[in-house]
Amino acid sequence: MIKKIIDFLFPNYCGICGNKINTSYTCEKCSNILECYKERVLMHTASNAHFDKLLCLFEYSGIMKQKMLEFKFSDKKYISRTLGELTFKKIKKYDLQADYLIPVPISKQRMFERGYNQSEYIANFLAEFCKIKVLNNCLIKSRNNSKQSLLSASERQHNVKNAYAVKNPEKIKGKTIMLIDDIMTTGATINECAKELKKYGAKEVIAIALLYSVRGGI
């Protein structure tokens, strides 16, 4: 439903430059520019990581930082379809496969303020490309906490502790989960989410972050 609405309102526009295009959601020029960005890939994670693999698509800088901020805070939801397409190209490049996609949830307060969960939008468009089902309400935010962006690396670890919970754990037991987040800084949020998924029987968790800004952590 989300895809149909956005496609109807914003047909044939590149989510990066805004130019009209005939196919895809990213024009050839922008695609070539984005190919120069270096992704961060960990196929064997650190001992303190609860996820099994990590793929971060773009550094949190330049045009991608600008587009993510526009998507999150300027209500430019159509950018999510380009982000979904770019994510699909990267997971295809590394042959990453999963049984389900699960977006990192946000609090009810943040949902009220913004009106949507940006990671859920990205996951829904990614699902259109990779044909993997999204479990939108399987992982939930169980309590409100402070904004991660205002905290130090050590404070972030404490801030997200026990902030997430799994509903319907039978759906993820023995399954490989692709966990979708918008921005990873220290990895505290995505690691805590992965911990909960593993706690309730997920076989493997592949963490995917669209942008990364390393400030110490995993």
Protein language model regions, located:
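Glycine-rich phosphate/pyrophosphate-handling loop used in enzymes and phosphotransfer proteins
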Residues: 1-181, 185-218
